[in-house]
């Protein structure tokens, strides 16, 4: 009985320390906002257009795939290109977070051993850098919206809570994958391979309407729900109740799992990195 009480007290103590770590990490926002921007900027040092290469690369991919697959799928390019662009841009954010989360603490290991600071600070920095990449890529959608005279109307406001759900889920995933991948170095390769398969199983290049008989496959795909709640408002739609409910439910579940996982392994990350 005493042993169970001690274990419960210890778990509660670890959870409180983890929450304090997250609060402390957020309080360091001036530092991680600067470091996140510097990380992106340093990748394109001495380049003429700098981080705008992100925008240019995404633009060329959208244009190339859009022209090709609109012919293959026999879809009007004016209808296909905006949908494809948003799908690729959102996938870039999701994929970047999941793949990059595996390297958070292996990259920050040196700094963690030399400077005492909240472990979550490095997660905040990473998520911020991914948002900066997303912002550069999002310029492609803005250009397409202007070219094709798109008017999503007031539904576009739903884009902001949708993006918040994606970012929160990304933060929670990073709290899990960061320590996990620091401990087991084969996990990043496994995740990288899985994400390549998931890309083709998610309606990014193709549309969900093209697979009506296998709708359950989409329902079981969490990436589909997150992409749709962002894509629909930008196309002037509200999104389905299923997509929103699934996205909110997944975010809450990830938050609960991440809190328990981070509370248990947060203190060991510095030894694994």
Region locations from a protein language model:
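Hydrophobic transmembrane alpha-helices and immediately adjacent juxtamembrane helices
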Residues: 1-273
